[in-house]
């Protein structure tokens, strides 16, 4: 009988195979090109059955001078173990900066991707938050978008669908006149029409379109088109219309003359203008649609397997100064030949006719191999630009992410050195039976800083041994740039989870918590951003305006 002698290299080969398998499993998912003809949001899970709710202390996560406060807490201010919350948008009352509201996708149980329209509000500048529940208990909702008018009235645009057969894919509009504490459906069920990946803006110019609302969405929609308008502050909405070249996955804004601009990506990025959307008795037309070079394309997958790695944000300067009516666009894009995303920025000083060459905001040296995703920004009343995004530059596994911040005081010509403003978190933890942490985060700026709503996985769920997705608020500000934040250990809950004998995960409404501190935005001297050379603008002819038919 032939005998075999074990090779001394066999254990080494096995070890190499195990390491290879482990490494492969840690690799990000492939990236993919998003398109609007297949919805990114689907009603494909029923609600999870009722369960006993466990809680742990709410998370307050300091990182140097920046402090993140958990938003989705129960009636007692505790973290709810086993739920998930992501894809958050923030609104700020311009008449009282201590009053803010955040909307998000609320998953009552991570075993089901059934989601609802969660919301929370604060009256003390974000130190404490109240989470009364969801807009409409038991109804599937997604893609939350919130905004405020100049009086401090908040609006919440929410996507709805049906199950098990998807018979509609429409939006409706809600309004709050008490700082986000309660919300009323003003458009009627599915009354805003719309569709998937919708966004909206409010005309606050005081002109003929004052308080008009404008909405854009993608091709997975309720009644065709990509755009519609409300001339009565969100109550009734007109039949949707097409936008030439079909820019989607973007946002809208209105300049001081009442011109509407829509940013998004079709075959390339576009900036579309309607100069007559503000005229109530005219059908809106898009009289200028200009291609924009953002230095890459939008993408999905990768570090956020089932979601986008970012969308296109467009915002306009309303400072009234030399930069007034500048149009800015920012997006996390996948550059040609690269497998990870960069935060890129462009500027127009001539009403969207031409744009600057794309400028990279993330300043890390090994940026080509790192992820810079969910990039978003806002324009302060004085014209300062604040940008935030998720960033893996400090992660050996190229997955753990931190929220980063940069600002510009010269219309985006130069940007300050990037600074981390949060602890590190693993975005692949706590998926609610859907492999993503949403599709976007948001920021709203005032004269001394920016208010950010983002999702992170700082809390731990002992029932499944994973971190869990929650919504956080953090205030970023230029004064923090002078300090080098020292990472502080994430504040881990130490209390034993407490079982609460209740059959629903949705917190009940409670009176607004007594503020523990009075929030007053304190003006800090704004350091001059460290100049970083802007690329020389690429010479190109001025595109001829494209007229909508």
Each predicted region: which residue ranges?
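Bacterial N-terminal signal peptides that target proteins for export
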Residues: 2-12
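Bacterial N-terminal signal peptides
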Residues: 11-22
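C-terminal PAP-associated
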Residues: 27-485
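Ser/Thr-rich, Proline-interspersed low-complexity disordered segments
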Residues: 29-31, 482-546
């Amino acid at each position: 009988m032939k005998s075999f002698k074990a090779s001394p290299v066999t254990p080494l080969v096995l070890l190499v195979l195990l390491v290879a398998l482990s490494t492969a499993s840690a690799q990000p998912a492939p990236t993919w090109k998003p398109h609007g003809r297949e919805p990114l949001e689907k009603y494909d899970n029923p609600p999870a059955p009722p369960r006993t709710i466990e809680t742990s202390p709410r998370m307050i996560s300091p990182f140097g001078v920046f402090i993140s406060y958990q938003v989705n807490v129960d009636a007692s201010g505790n973290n709810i173990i086993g739920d998930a919350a992501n894809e958050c948008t923030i609104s700020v009352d311009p008449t009282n900066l201590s009053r803010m509201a955040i909307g998000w996708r609320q998953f009552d149980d991570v075993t089901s991707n059934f989601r609802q329209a969660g919301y929370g509000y604060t009256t003390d500048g974000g130190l404490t938050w109240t989470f009364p529940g969801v807009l409409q208990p038991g109804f599937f909702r997604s893609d939350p978008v919130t905004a405020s008018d100049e009086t401090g009235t908040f609006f919440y645009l929410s996507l709805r669908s049906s199950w098990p057969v998807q018979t509609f894919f429409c939006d409706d509009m809600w309004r709050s006149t008490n700082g986000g504490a309660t919300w009323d459906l003003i458009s009627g069920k599915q009354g805003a029409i719309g569709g998937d990946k919708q966004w909206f803006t409010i005309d606050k110019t005081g002109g003929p379109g004052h308080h008009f609302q404008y909405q854009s969405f993608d091709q997975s929609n309720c009644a065709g088109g990509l755009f519609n308008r409300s001339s009565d502050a969100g109550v009734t909405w007109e039949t949707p219309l097409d936008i030439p070249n079909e820019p989607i996955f973007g946002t809208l804004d209105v300049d001081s003359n009442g011109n509407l601009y829509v940013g998004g990506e079709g075959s390339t990025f576009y900036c579309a203008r309607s100069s007559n959307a503000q005229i109530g008795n005219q059908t809106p037309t898009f009289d200028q649609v200009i291609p924009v070079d953002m230095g890459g394309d939008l993408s999905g997958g990768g570090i956020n397997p089932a979601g986008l790695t970012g969308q296109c944000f467009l915002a306009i300067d309303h400072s009234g100064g030399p930069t007034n009516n500048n149009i800015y666009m920012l997006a996390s894009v996948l550059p040609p030949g690269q497998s990870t995303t960069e935060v890129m920025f462009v500027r127009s000083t001539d009403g969207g006719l031409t744009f600057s060459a794309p400028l990279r905001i993330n300043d890390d040296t090994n940026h080509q191999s790192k992820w810079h995703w969910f990039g978003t920004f806002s324009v302060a009343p004085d014209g300062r630009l604040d940008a935030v995004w998720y960033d893996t530059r400090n992660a050996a596994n190229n997955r753990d992410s931190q929220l980063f911040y940069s600002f510009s005081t010269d219309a985006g010509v130069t940007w300050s050195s990037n600074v981390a403003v949060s602890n590190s978190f693993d975005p692949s933890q706590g998926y609610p039976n859907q492999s993503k942490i949403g599709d976007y985060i948001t920021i709203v700026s005032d004269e001394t800083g920016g208010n950010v709503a983002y999702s992170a996985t700082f809390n731990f769920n002992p029932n499944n041994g994973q971190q869990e997705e929650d919504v956080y608020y953090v205030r970023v500000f230029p004064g923090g740039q002078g300090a080098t934040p020292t990472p502080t250990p994430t504040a881990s809950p130490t209390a034993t989870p407490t079982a609460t004998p209740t059959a629903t995960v949705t917190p009940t409404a409670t009176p607004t918590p007594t503020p523990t501190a009075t929030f007053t935005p304190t003006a800090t001297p704004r350091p001059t951003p460290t100049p970083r050379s802007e690329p020389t603008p690429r010479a190109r002819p001025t595109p001829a305006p494209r007229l909508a038919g």
